[in-house]
Amino acid sequence: MGDVKLFASSHMSKTSHSVDPSKVSSMPLTEAPAFILPPRNLCVKEGATAKFEGRVRGYPEPQVTWHRKGQAITNGGRFLLDCGVRGTFSLVIHTVREEDKGKYTCEASNGSGARQVTVELTVEGNSMKKRDQPVLSKASGFPGETRPSIWGECPPKFATKLGRAVVKEGQMWRFSCKITGRPPPQVTWLKGNVPLQPSARVSMSEKNGMQILEIRGVTRDDLGVYTCMVVNGSGKASMSAELSIPGLDNASRLAVRGTKAPSPDIRKEVTNGVSKDPETVAESKNCPSPQRSGSSARATNSHLKSPQEPKPKLCEDAPRKVPQSSILQKSTSTITLQALKVQPEARVPAIGSFSPGEDRKSLAAPQQATLPTRQSSLGGSVGNKFVTGNIPRESQRESTFPRFESQPQSQEVTEGQTVKFICEVSGIPKPDVGWFLEGIPVRRREGITEVYEDGVSHHLCLLRARTRDSRKYSCTASNSLGQVSCSWSLLVDRPNLAQTAPSFSSVLKDSVVIEGQDFVLRCSVQGTPAPRVTWLLNGQPIQFAHSICEAGVAELHIQDALPEDRGTYTCLAENAMGQVSCSATVTVQEKKGEGEREHRLSPARSKPIAPIFLQGLSDLKVMDGSQVTMTVQVSGNPPPEVIWLHDGNEIQESEDFHFEQKGGWHSLCIQEVFPEDTGTYTCEAWNSAGEVRTRAVLTVQEPHDGTQPWFISKPRSVTATLGQSVLISCAIAGDPFPTVHWLRDGRALSKDSGHFELLQNEDVFTLVLKNVQPWHAGQYEILLKNRVGECSCQVSLMLHNSPSRAPPRGREPASCEGLCGGGGVGAHGDGDRHGTLRPCWPARGQGWPEEEDGEDVRGLLKRRVETRLHTEEAIRQQEVGQLDFRDLLGKKVSTKTVSEDDLKDIPAEQMDFRANLQRQVKPKTISEEERKVHSPQQVDFRSVLAKKGTPKTPVPEKAPPKAATPDFRSVLGGKKKSPSENGGNSAEVLNVKAGESPTPAGDAQAIGALKPVGNAKPAETPKPIGNAKPTETLKPVGNTKPAETLKPIANAQPSGSLKPVTNAQPAEPQKPVGNAKSAETSKPAGKEEVKEVKNDVNCKKGQVGATGNEKRPESQGSAPVFKEKLQDVHVAEGEKLLLQCQVISDPPATVTWSLNGKTLKTTKFIVLAQEGSRFSVSIEKALPEDRGLYKCVAKNSAGQAECSCQVTVDDAQTSENTKAPEMKSRRPKSSLPPVLGTESDATVKKKPAPKTPTKAAMPPQIIQFPEDQKVRAGEPVELFGKVAGTQPITCKWMKFRKQIQESEHIKVENGESGSKLTILAARQEHCGCYTLVVENKLGSRQAQVNLTVVDKPDPPAGTPCASDIRSSSLTLSWYGSSYDGGSAVQSYNVEIWDTEDKVWKELATCRSTSFNVQDLLPDREYKFRVRAVNVYGTSEPSQESELTAVGEKPEEPKDEVEVSDDDEKEPEVDYRTVTVNTEQKVSDVYDIEERLGSGKFGQVFRLVEKKTGKIWAGKFFKAYSAKEKDNIRQEISIMNCLHHPKLVQCVDAFEEKANIVMVLEIVSGGELFERIIDEDFELTERECIKYMRQISEGVEYIHKQGIVHLDLKPENIMCVNKTGTRIKLIDFGLARRLENAGSLKVLFGTPEFVAPEVINYEPIGYATDMWSIGVICYILVSGLSPFMGDNDNETLANVTSATWDFDDEAFDEISDDAKDFISNLLKKDMKNRLDCTQCLQHPWLMKDTKNMEAKKLSKDRMKKYMARRKWQKTGNAVRAIGRLSSMAMISGLSGRKSSTGSPTSPINAEKLESEDDVSQAFLEAVAEEKPHVKPYFSKTIRDLEVVEGSAARFDCKIEGYPDPEVVWFKDDQSIRESRHFQIDYDEDGNCSLIISDVCGDDDAKYTCKAVNSLGEATCTAELIVETMEEGEGEEGGEEEEEEEE
C-alpha cells in the first residue's frame, strides 16, 4: 500500500494526515528510505527560529521534501531547506509566526519507495495567559495537554478492510486485515464490546503483517459484529465486520445487529502529542467533555448544547437506521464521526462503554443533530481529529460524502507498456475527481496521458510508461460535503535488453554545397542502451548548429553555409559498451560577388546567441587534501565570459584556485581542498544575448577518528518565578571531548553580563541564572561541538509572576486561576496558611516538562500519563536500537562515557538540579562507622516546600515571604554541617534510625500514596518531629477520575501554606516538620486506603476539586474485576520474569503496577504491556532487586480492584557472609535489595577509615607512574615511580628482563617514596619498555612505561639495485629503512652521481621504494644512493649502488630481489620438510644482516646461508609460554604441507630458549597493493586477471591439503620482485586444518575481509577464504572497499548485512565477466560461493591475457584506499573480533561485561564449553605477544564529589598479562552488577564503575581490585554525595538562618 491521506474539510478548515507508505517491490541493490534520526516536534517562541532536522538513509540517496497543509514547502523567504551529507536534512523557519504552527510532513523518497514522518510546530505567544480569565477543566483519563512527542509518529491505520462474512453453520471462517502505524500498534479483537479470548475454536494470529481472526465450526452463537481494535501511543483505530449465516430470520438478525456497532466502520482517535480542541473528537475511551481545553471551551458549549436534552446525554453508537456522515479511506475503511450531545460541565461517558440494553433504549430516540456542518466554532479542529454533524435524514438522502468504491492499485511495469489506473467514486452531489503526480495535477497530453470518465469509473492512462514515471500518484474525490483521497505507486523497470556497442547502419556521405545554402548530414546508428551522439568539425565540437537524434537517425542541420563551414564532419556515437564514429567531407563553394557575400554574412555572423552549457557541473564528494577540477563546456555568440562563485561569492584566481580555458571548455582547479571548501559552486556564463549558470555541491569529507558529541543526560525546561535562581544542567560526552556553547534565542550568552555563571564538574555542565528577570525567559540552546560533529538540545525558561495574596479562610476563590486542562499544579503558587489552594498552571501550549520517571510528580494534581509517556519512550528505544550496531560483536565502544543505549533509560532526574535550588548541603552528621551500622533511612526532601523560618504563630493576612537567592557555589560545593546547625525546626529530618517510617503530610494514602521505601516494617509507628500538629489533611478531589489522583506535597506544613512546586519530586517517605504535632499515625505502606480528609482544597465545581458539601455524581458502569489474577513466581537470576493478569471493567480501567510499594514504569529492563484486557510486566533478565511484592491496581470511575503476587529471584551466586538485607536496602529513590556481598580477604585500602585498627603490613604499591613517553633524540628523560607499602622496599628498573645499571648516560635514584630513572640524552637504543619492580617481604609489584625516541630515520637498508636497464633508462629499487625514527617514512630522496661530473646531485623525490630513472646518457656510468625522510628529518644516505651504464644489462646477481620477472616460467623451488632445530643457533648456519621489517609477531632479518650464499628471510619470534611455542610449531607444520610455487616456503627453523626463528624464502617485491600504486606500474584488467589467477591457484592448493588460510588480505599477498606480476601468499599463522576438525568456529579475522559466518560465530569452511578473495578482487579492480566503514564496528555491521553494489563509476570500465566473478564470491550463504576450481574455470580468469584489450584503470581510488587503510590500522596486523575472559568469576562478578545480547555475538559464554575452549579462543584472538605481568593500574580512580540524583563514574585503566579479572568494592563489600551499579571493562583495559541515580547511601569509599594468576592490584577513591535541602531567605538576599529555637 502506498501513501494514504485522510482529508477532513469544511468551509472553515482542512486537515490531513499521512501514513507511512509501505515499500514497493524494489529493484536489486536498492534500499527504500528509512529515517535514522527522525525530525522532532518543536515548541518555540514567536519570533524565534525553528529548525527541524534529521537524517535519512536509502539507496539511491533519498530526496527529502516538506509539506504543510498538502502544499510543498519551497526554499525562499523565511523557509530554508537544506540537505547535507550522509542523509542529513533540515527545515529552518526564521522569525516564526503564529500562523506557522501546525503539522509538517517530511517525505523521503527514491526509486525504491518513500517514507513519511509528521512533526508538529507549537508557537508560544509572547504574553502569558490572563490570570483572571475563567477557565474550565474536566477530569479525564487523558491529559488535557501534554508536551508533543519528540519523535514523529504515525497513528494506527488499516491498510486493508474487513469484509462482511456470510458463512454456513459448522464451517470455518477467517477475518483478516493489515495495519500500519508507529510504534507498532497493539491489536485486540472484540465481539460486540467484549474482547475475544483464544480457545479451541477461536484463534488470533499475525502472519506477514496481516492480523487474522479464525473461528472454527461457526454456530449461531457466533453471529454478530467483530471488531479489530488497534492502539499505539499516537492514537487508535478500529474496524468492524459482521458475521452472518444465510437463511437466518431477518428479524433476529436485525435484533442482533441492532445491539452492535454498524459495519464496517473505523473509529479513530488520534492524539498526536497535543490535544487542542477536544470538542472535535469523534470518539474516545473516556469520552471527554468540551471543557477539556482551556479558554475556547466555553464558547464551544453553546454550539454543543442540545435543547431537547435537559440532562447530560451519553455519547453512544448511533443505531443503524440513523444516517451517519462518514469519511472513507483507502480499502473503503470508514471513519465514523458522530455529533456530541453534551451539556456544559457535564460528564460524558465513552462510546462503546454501554450494555446492549442501553443501546436498545437509544433506538427509540434517534439523535437529532443540532450542530450545523458549517458551524464556525469548529474551525479549531486540530491534527487528525475530524468532526461532522449528524445531518437530518431528509437532507442526508440528498447528499452523501464522497467515497471510493474501488481504488487504483500500485503497479510494476516494464518501460514502454501502457498503464491504466481505474477508480470508482460515489457521492451526492457527484464528486469531482482529480489525479495527481507527486501532488501536481495530471492533465491530458496528446499521445502521452489520457484522463477520461466512463460512467462511474474514472481512468488515468499512461500510453507509454517511462522510467521517470516511477512516482507516487494520488486521486481525490470531493463534493460540497468534503474530500477523500487515496494514493499508490508506479514502478517502471527498464527491460533487460542485451547491451550492444554502437554501430552505424548507414554512414555520412561527402557533399558539396553552395555558400548560403542549408544542408543536412544524416546517418543511422544503433546500440543498446541508445548511444549518445556528438558532432565534430575538424575534430572540434560544433558550437552553432542544430542536431537531433530520433529513432536511431542522427541529423546535423547547418543553415546558411559559409566557407568556414567546410571541413571534415564526424558523428561520434558512444554508450557504456563502447564508441564508434563516421566522417564525411563537406565542401562549400563560394559565391562570386564578394561584396554581396560580406553584406549577407555580416548579419548572420553578428546574430547573437545566448550561452548554453554543453556540459554542466555535477556534485562531487572528495576527501580532505584531494585535488579537484570542475569543468564546463559553454557555447554562445559572441563567446561568453565566465566567472566562478563559491556560496555566492566570486572566486578570485590565486595560488589555491586556478582558472583554465581551452576553446569553449572552462575549468576551475583547486590544488588541495580543505573542509572549508565545502559548498555550492556556480559557474555563470554571459554575453550580450543572455546569461546562464550551472551549479553543483562540493563536499569535502574528513577522515575523523572519534565519537560525535551527545548528551548523557539532557537538560529540561524550567518554569520559575521572578527573583528566583535557576539551574539548567546537562551531562555530555564525545571523543574528543566537545566544546560547549550556550545560546539564548539563537544568540550566544555574553559572559560580561554577570547575570549568569557557568559551572563544570567533569562531564556535567551547569548554567546558573541568579535573580531571574523577565529578559532571562526564552529558548536556551546547548550546542556541543567536536571535530567529528555537533549536537544540540533546546530547553525553555518560562516565568510566572508571583500570585497575589490568598482569599480569607473558608471562602472559595472566584475561579481557579490559570488552570489549563493539562492537569498539574504550577510551581510557585502561594496559598494562605489555612491550606486554601491557589494553583498556578502553565499557559496554554506550554505544557509540562516531559518526565521520564513515573515517580517524579511535578505538582499537586499532575495527571497520570504513564501509558502515554512509556509509549514514547519505547519508540525512542526501539528506533535508536534498530540502528545501533555497537554491540554487534559484544564490543564496548571505547568512550569514557556510558553507552548511549544504557543512558536512554537513566532517568533525566539524575542530572536535574532544578528541584534542589533552595537547599543547603545535607549535614554529614555521624561517623562512617555509625553510618555503616545504622544504615539510616535517608529521606528525599526534593518536594519540600515548608520554609525554615516560618513564624510560630503565622498571621492569616500576611502572605509568606519570598525565597531569597541562595549562593549556588555553596549549594554545589558547600561544607557539611553538624546536627546542631540544623535544629529541630529544620525543613528536613536526617539520619532517621533504621526501622522508623516517616509520617506523610496528612493521611492521603491511596491518593498520593506516600509509602516508606525499602524494607521499613509496616507495623512501626512513624515518629512526628518537633511540635507538628497536622490539623488538616489533603482531601480526595470530587468528580476526579482515579487516573489523576492527588499527589500530596511531602513535608508540606498542613497548618501553614501549601506551595505546590513544578519540580517537586515526592513519592518518598516524608515527615511533617515545623510547628506541628502528629494527630495520628500513618497507615502501613502498601495498604491503598482512601481516607476522607478535611482540608480546604477548594476549586470551582466540576474542576480540580470539590468541597465536602458538594455531591459527587453517581459513577457509571461497573468496577474492575480481575478475571485472571497474578500468581506467585519463582525464577533464577538471569531468567525472564513474566507476570500477567486480566481485568474486566466498564469503562476501561487505568492499571498501575508497583513493586514493594514503588510505582513501576516501562524502562529498558522492565516492559509494561497491555493486550486488550490482559496486562503484563516482563523483565528479560531478572535480578535479585526484582524480587518482592508486585501489585496491580485497576481503577475506573466506578471503583478499583487490586491483586498481588510474590516474586522470588534466586541469586546466581549467594555469598555466605551477605549481611542482613535491612542493612543496605533503605536507600531513598530505590527499591534495590542488597547488592553488596563480602569477600573473605580484607580489601587493602589506600586511605583507611579514621577509626580502623592499626594499619596492617602492606605489600608494595606503585601509586604514581608516568604514561608512555615520546621524546626527540638528544633530549633528557625522567621516569619517576611513586611507591607505598611497608618498608623496606627495594626498587629496580628493568629493560628487556635485564636490570638497568647506572652509566654515564643513565642515572637511577632510589628513595623511600619511590625511584627515578634519568636518561641524560635519549638515543635510539634507549627505546623500549622500562619496568619498575618494587619488592618488600610481603610481595612485589611492577609497572611498565614505553619510551619512544623519535629521530630522523635510519638510511635505507642494503644497496640500491638497478634493473630493467634500457637504452636511456633503468629502474632503481631499494629497501626501506630498518628503523623509521619513530615516525612513518614519508618519502625517499634519490641522488645520482656520474663519471663525468663526479658530484652527488638530488635526482627526484618519491614515495615508493622504486623509481624509473629517465634520460640517462650512454657515454657515462652512474651510481645512485637514497635518503629516507620523515617528519623529524632526512636520513643519512644509503650505501651506493654499483656503477651502472645504460644500453647494457648487468650481470645478474644471485639475490632474487634483483631478478627480473618472467611470467611464463616459475623458477625451481627448493621444497623442504622442516623440523625445529634445537641443537644449533641460527647464527651457526646463517649470517644475520639488516632488519627488513617488524610486526606484532617479532622481527624479520635478512639471512645469508653460509654454505651456499643464498639469501633468505628470518622471522624471529618471542615465545615465552608453551602455548605460544605450540602455536608457532603448528604454523611450521602447516607450511610443511604447502609446497607450491604460489606459497612462500619455510626452509629451516631454530629454537633457543624463548626465541624461535623460521627461515623463509625471500619475497622482495613488497605488498601487492603497494606495487600497484607505484608510479611505474600500469594497472589494467589484464593484470588483475593475472593476480587473481595466481591467488586462486595458491588457495586451491591450500584447500586440497585440508587447510583454510583464514587471513587472506592484501598485506598477505607479496610480489616476488618489483618488475613482474608473480606473487606469493604468506603468513599462515591463523591457518587451521579442517579435516577431522568437526564443526570449526573461529573468533578472529580482519574486519574488512572476514566472512559473515565468522562474525556470526557459525561453522566455517573452505568457502570462508573465498569470501576474502571476492573482497580482494573487488578492491583490486575498483580501488573501492565494499564493506569498509568509519570504524571496525561499522565495517562488521556492513559485512553481516552483506549488501554491496557495482554502482560506482569505478565499475564503468570493468567487464561484466569480472563483475560476475565477484558476485559469485560475495554470497552471504557460503554454500553458494564458487570454490577455487570453479574460479579458475570462470570465463573471466580463462581470458587470453596476451591478446585481450588492455584498458588502463585509474589508480587514484586505490591510492586513497591505501591511505585510508593505513590511517585505520591500529598497528596489529590482525584485530581480534572477540575478547574472552580467561578466569573464573570473583564474588559472582564477571570480569568483563559480556555482550548485551546481540543474537550474532560469539562472545556469549555458553558457546565455550571448557577451559580449553577459552584458552583456544584467547589464542585465536591473537593478542599481542608479551611477557606475563602482574596487574597494575596505569590510571587510578579518583575521588568524586557529585550532587544527589546525578550519575557518578569511576574510571581506571588496568594493565597486566594474562588479562586481569576485576572486582569492585563499596567500603569492605564486593559490588554485584545491577541496574544501580554498572561495570564496563573494555579490551584496552579501561574499566569503569557507573553509579546511576546517586543517593546519600552511595557516599562511601570504592575500591577496584584486579587479579590474575601472577598477583593482584587495587586502587581506592571516595565518593562524596551532596544532598540538597530547602533553604529560606528574606527578600533582598539575606543569609539563610542556621539555627532556630
UniProtKB/Swiss-Prot annotation:
Disulfide bonds: C177-C228, C423-C475, C523-C571, C730-C793, C1141-C1192, C1852-C1904
Modified residues (Phosphotyrosine): Y226, Y452, Y780, Y1471, Y1597, Y1657
InterPro entries given in the database record: FN3_dom, FN3_sf, Ig-like_dom, Ig-like_dom_sf, Ig-like_fold, Ig_I-set, Ig_sub, Ig_sub2
Catalyzed reaction equations: L-seryl-[myosin light chain] + ATP = O-phospho-L-seryl-[myosin light chain] + ADP + H(+); L-threonyl-[myosin light chain] + ATP = O-phospho-L-threonyl-[myosin light chain] + ADP + H(+)
Stretches the record annotates as Actin-binding (calcium/calmodulin-sensitive): 911-951
Composition skew (Basic and acidic residues), residue ranges: 306-320, 1085-1099
Region (5 X 12 AA approximate tandem repeats): 990-1049
Subcellular compartments: Cytoplasm; Cell projection, Lamellipodium; Cleavage furrow; Cytoplasm, Cytoskeleton, Stress fiber
Cofactor(s) this protein requires: Mg(2+); Ca(2+)
GO cellular-component term (any): cleavage furrow
SMART domains: FN3, IG, IGc2, S_TKc
Highest taxon of the lineage: Eukaryota
Entry's EC annotation: 2.7.11.18
Subunit record text: All isoforms including Telokin bind calmodulin. Interacts with CTTN; this interaction is reduced during thrombin-induced endothelial cell (EC) contraction but is promoted by the barrier-protective agonist sphingosine 1-phosphate (S1P) within lamellipodia. A complex made of ABL1, CTTN and MYLK regulates cortical actin-based cytoskeletal rearrangement critical to sphingosine 1-phosphate (S1P)-mediated endothelial cell (EC) barrier enhancement. Binds to NAA10/ARD1. Interacts with SVIL and PTK2B/PYK2.
Record's protein name: Myosin light chain kinase, smooth muscle
Lineage, opening ranks: Eukaryota, Metazoa, Chordata, Craniata, Vertebrata
